[in-house]
A protein has these predicted regions:
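Structural signature of the two symmetry-related core transmembrane helices
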Residues: 86-101, 301-316
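Helix-loop boundary and gating motifs at the non-cytosolic
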Residues: 6-64, 236-268, 272-275
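Juxtamembrane intracellular "pre-TM" segments in multi-pass secondary transporters
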Residues: 2-13, 205-242
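A membrane-interface helix-boundary motif in multi-pass transporters
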Residues: 49-50, 168-191, 381-400
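Glycine-rich segments within core transmembrane alpha-helices of 12-TM secondary carriers
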Residues: 146-168, 365-375
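Helix-loop junctions at membrane interfaces in 12-TM secondary transporters
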Residues: 102-115, 318-330
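Helix-to-loop junctions at the C-terminal end of transmembrane segments
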Residues: 69-83, 285-298, 383
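Multi-pass alpha-helical transporter architecture, strongest
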Residues: 192-203, 394-418
């Protein structure tokens, strides 16, 4: 990870970014090969294409509900001195073991149960990973470091993915079944995730924290109760979270359900996977560009640009019927995906108390990190009610419009120092 210009990453910042490289491989698997694995099991179980898309969406929503309950609780406990790293390790362990175990499922229902466990572990780890940003860098460097995290996550995750894709597409030529190839792909992804996590575990130290008290867990519940009661008083945080809930729900729905959407439309599997690989490649320089732009323009100006672009993406997806259109969609998503994620993370990190970063990022996670609730429900319900996947995905434009308006409101409530 060579740096250009005057900006130089510290060793700790590089190790923090490296975790993004690891967990992003799992994200890419969830967006590409895991839905194909589930589709094969669903077909053998007699599910229709519409039922397949609907169940995938409902499971994604279930993950978000579980994570929404656990994240603020665990995040608040993790703010206590010495707690953040152990809980982070636990979540990573659950995610990695779940990733390995998915390959053992022989029916669609057990597969979904294991997937929920793995995704909850993954989503939980992101609460603590994101909250570490205030410990690994300074406020003036957050936009750039956060953007580089997403950028290297996108391009770094392509390394195991290309190998996994080669295994799946070339399974017959090397004498193994496609299901065996998918099992190997899951194991490879888990190994990559583990190896890229170790440097952060070795170097990270919790700098901002709440001192250890008697009955730490009970006190953590008291702190989060106090924060929730008084959250509306901090208007810059309150209105941002409302806006973030809407627009990031749409973003993560597109990420999580892209392959399932294309499959439901009957598009070629190989073309879909290669198009999503292009998304990762395009997202790498795009995220870096947004990081550089953040040195010149405040995130309050850049985030609305990304939201507006996603509204256009939802409209385009409504009319999508052919594979070449999916390729265009993949490129456009790649241009703005990293920017909206990275800038939202760093924007939030700068407006919250650093010693309560775990607690606040638990709330941040509820609003859509890892998997989306409202967005996936909109897509699933819309698809089932109309019999058209296009209508379901196109309906996401509502989330982006509302998110755009609420974000502008949040910026007017109080100027956020950049």
């Amino acid at each position: 990870m060579e740096k250009s210009g005057k900006f130089r990453l510290t060793s700790l910042e590089r190790n923090w970014i490296l975790y993004d490289v690891g967990n992003s491989a799992f994200v890419l698997m969830v967006a590409t090969l895991i839905p194909i694995f589930f589709n094969a099991l669903a077909e053998s179980g007699g599910l229709s294409s519409v039922e397949y898309l609907a169940y995938w969406g409902y499971v994604s929503s279930a993950v978000t509900i579980i994570t929404a309950v656990l994240s603020p609780i665990l995040g608040t406990v993790a703010d206590t001195k010495g707690f953040k790293k152990p809980i982070f390790i636990l979540c990573v362990f659950v995610g990695i073991v779940g990733c390995c175990a998915m390959g053992a499922a022989s029916a669609w229902l057990p597969f979904l149960v294991i997937f929920v466990i793995a995704k909850v572990g993954f989503s939980g780890s992101l609460v603590f990973y994101d909250s570490m940003l205030s410990d690994v860098t300074t406020p003036e460097r957050m936009d750039e470091v956060s953007s580089r995290g997403y950028a290297w996550g996108y391009i770094g995750s392509c390394v195991p993915f290309v190998v996994c894709l080669g295994l799946v597409l070339g399974a017959g030529s090397i004498g193994i079944s496609q299901m065996t190839a998918l099992n190997l792909a899951l194991l490879l992804t888990a190994a990559w995730w583990l190896l890229t996590t170790l440097p952060l575990l070795k170097s990270y130290k919790q700098l901002h924290y709440v001192e250890v008290e008697k009955h730490a867990v009970r006190q953590s519940f008291a702190r989060i109760g106090h924060t929730l009661r008084h959250l509306p008083e901090d208007k810059r945080v309150f209105w941002f979270l409302l806006a973030f809930f809407c627009y990031i729900d749409g973003v993560y729905t597109i990420i999580d359900m892209a392959t399932a959407y294309g499959t439901a439309l009957g598009l070629d599997t190989t073309g879909l996977l290669l198009a999503l690989l292009v998304t990762q490649i395009v997202a790498f320089p795009s995220a870096l560009i947004f990081g550089r732009l953040s040195n010149k323009y405040p995130s309050a100006k850049l985030i609305p640009v990304c939201i507006a672009a996603y509204a256009g993406i939802a409209v385009f997806a409504f009319f999508l019927t052919q594979q070449w259109q999916f390729w265009v969609l993949a490129v456009i998503v790649g241009m703005f995906q990293g920017g909206v994620q990275a800038l939202s993370r760093s924007h939030f990190a700068k407006i919250i108390p650093p010693e309560k970063s775990g607690e606040y990022f638990g709330l941040f996670d509820i609003c859509g990190k890892g998997a989306s609730f409202l967005g996936t429900m909109i897509v699933s319900a819309g698809s089932q009610l109309t019999g058209s996947a296009n209508v379901g995905v196109g309906s996401l434009i509502v989330l982006f419009i509302v998110g755009f308006v609420l974000f502008r409101v949040s910026c007017k409530k109080e100027v956020v120092p950049e």
